[in-house]
C-alpha cells in the first residue's frame, strides 16, 4: 500500500514515521514535484494542483484539518484537481473537539463574569464591582451543529448554561433547544446573549456574521468566532459595537491571517484577538484517525469524515 504526504508546514518525517508505526505494511513518502508514481491514499493540506490532478488509483484523500474550504476553492479555480469519485475526508475531531470546548467555555465564562469590563476598568485604575449577569438571561447560542458544534453545546450545558443551537437541517442535542433552516434563524438569534460561530465555510455561510444578524441578537450581546474568518464582515462588527448590538467579541479566525499589524482589531478595547489557536491539529490523534479510516476502507467499511463536495463540508 502506497501513501503520499504533503503539508507546507508540518514535519513530514514525524508524520511518515508515525503512520508507519500504525500501519507497518505501508510505504509512505513525502510528495515532491514530479512524483507521479502510484499511490493508494494521499494525506494533504493545500496541495499543489499537480499532486492530485490526473492521478489514477487513489482510494481516498485525507485533509489534515477540519476545514476543507481551501482545497475546494483550489478545485473551483482549477477544475480537475480532485480525481472524480475519490472520497475526500476531513478530520472531524482528532482532538480538536476538546480544544474547542475549552476555548468556548473559557470565553463564555470570561463574559459571564464580566472579565472584559474589569480589564477595561483596570486600565482606568477604577475600582468598581459590577452586577453579575443572571444565568437565565445569559443564553448561549451555537451556530452550527456539526461534530464540533455539538460537543461545544453539550459542554456548555454541563457547565449549567442555557444553550440553543442552529443548523441548516434538523439536529437533536440533549438539553439543547434546536433551531434549523432560514425560517428559524431569527428566533434563534433573538434569544441568544452569546453567539458562538462554528459553521462550516461555504458560499452560503460566508459573510453571515454581519450587521443585520448582530441587530437580531439580544441587546448588548457577545460574539465568539472560532470557525472561519470569512464568516465575519469585519467592518460590520465594528459598527455593531459602536451601535451597542455587540459589547464584546472574541475572534480566533480572520479574513487575512496573520492579522495585519495595523488592523483595528488589535487595539479595540472590546475585541479579544487570538492567533487561530482555538483548535489545532494534534498529530498523534490525527494519525490514529486516518489509520483507522484506512483500515475501514481496506475492509470495505464506511470511513468517517467524508465530505459532501456539493455542500462544502
From Swiss-Prot:
Classify the main location.
cytoplasm
Query: Could you name the domain of life of the organism this protein comes from?
Result: Bacteria
Q: Which GO terms describe its cellular component?
A: cytoplasm
An example Gene Ontology molecular-function term: hydroxypyruvate reductase (NADH) activity
Residues forming the catalytic site: 228, 276
- The set of disulfide-linked cysteines is none
Q: Which InterPro entries match?
A: D-isomer_DH_CS (IPR029753), D-isomer_DH_NAD-bd (IPR006140), GhrA_Enterobacterales (IPR023514), NAD(P)-bd_dom_sf (IPR036291)
The EC number on file is 1.1.1.79, 1.1.1.81
Q: Which Pfam families match?
A: 2-Hacid_dh_C
Keyword rRNA-binding recorded: no
- Reaction(s) the record says it catalyses: glycolate + NADP(+) = glyoxylate + NADPH + H(+); (R)-glycerate + NAD(+) = 3-hydroxypyruvate + NADH + H(+); (R)-glycerate + NADP(+) = 3-hydroxypyruvate + NADPH + H(+)
Q: Where in the cell is it found?
A: Cytoplasm
Which UniProt keywords are listed?
Cytoplasm, NAD, NADP, Oxidoreductase
Task: Output the HAMAP family linked to this UniProt entry.
Answer: 2_Hacid_dh_C_GhrA
Family stated for the protein in its record: Belongs to the D-isomer specific 2-hydroxyacid dehydrogenase family. GhrA subfamily.
> Any idea what job this protein has?
Catalyzes the NADPH-dependent reduction of glyoxylate and hydroxypyruvate into glycolate and glycerate, respectively.
- Tell me the protein's name: Glyoxylate/hydroxypyruvate reductase A
- Could you tell me which species this protein originates from? Photorhabdus laumondii subsp. laumondii (strain DSM 15139 / CIP 105565 / TT01)
Amino acid at each position: 500500500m502506497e501513501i503520499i504526504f504533503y503539508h507546507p508546514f508540518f514535519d513530514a518525517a514525524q508524520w511518515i514515521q508515525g503512520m508507519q508505526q500504525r500501519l507497518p505494511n505501508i510505504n509512505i513518502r513525502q510528495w515532491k514535484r514530479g512524483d507521479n508514481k502510484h499511490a493508494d491514499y494521499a494525506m494533504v493540506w493545500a496541495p499543489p494542483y499537480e499532486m492530485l490532478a490526473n492521478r489514477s488509483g487513489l482510494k481516498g484523500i485525507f485533509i489534515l484539518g477540519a476545514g476543507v474550504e481551501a482545497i475546494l476553492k483550489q478545485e473551483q479555480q482549477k477544475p480537475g484537481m480532485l480525481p472524480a469519485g475519490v472520497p475526500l475526508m476531513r478530520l472531524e475531531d482528532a482532538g480538536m473537539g476538546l480544544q474547542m470546548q475549552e476555548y468556548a467555555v473559557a470565553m463564555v465564562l470570561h463574559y459571564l463574569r464580566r472579565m472584559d469590563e474589569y480589564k477595561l476598568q483596570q486600565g482606568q485604575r477604577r475600582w468598581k464591582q459590577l452586577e453579575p449577569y443572571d444565568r437565565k438571561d445569559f443564553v448561549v447560542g451555537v451556530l452550527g451543529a456539526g461534530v464540533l458544534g455539538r460537543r461545544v453545546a453539550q459542554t456548555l450545558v454541563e457547565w449549567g448554561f442555557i444553550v440553543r443551537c442552529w443548523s441548516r437541517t434538523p439536529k437533536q442535542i440533549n438539553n439543547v433547544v434546536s433551531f434549523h433552516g432560514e425560517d428559524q434563524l431569527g428566533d434563534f438569534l433573538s434569544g441568544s446573549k452569546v453567539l458562538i460561530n462554528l459553521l462550516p465555510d461555504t458560499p452560503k455561510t460566508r459573510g453571515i456574521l454581519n450587521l443585520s444578524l448582530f441587530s437580531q441578537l439580544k441587546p448588548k450581546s457577545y460574539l465568539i468566532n472560532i470557525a472561519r474568518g470569512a464568516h465575519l464582515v469585519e467592518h460590520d462588527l465594528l459598527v455593531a459595537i459602536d451601535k451597542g448590538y455587540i459589547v464584546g467579541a472574541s475572534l480566533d479566525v480572520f479574513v487575512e491571517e496573520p492579522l495585519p499589524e495595523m488592523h483595528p482589531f488589535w487595539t479595540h478595547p472590546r475585541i479579544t484577538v487570538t492567533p487561530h489557536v482555538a483548535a489545532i491539529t494534534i498529530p498523534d490523534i490525527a494519525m490514529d484517525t486516518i489509520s483507522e479510516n484506512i483500515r475501514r476502507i481496506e475492509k470495505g467499511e464506511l470511513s468517517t469524515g467524508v465530505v459532501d463536495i456539493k455542500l462544502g463540508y
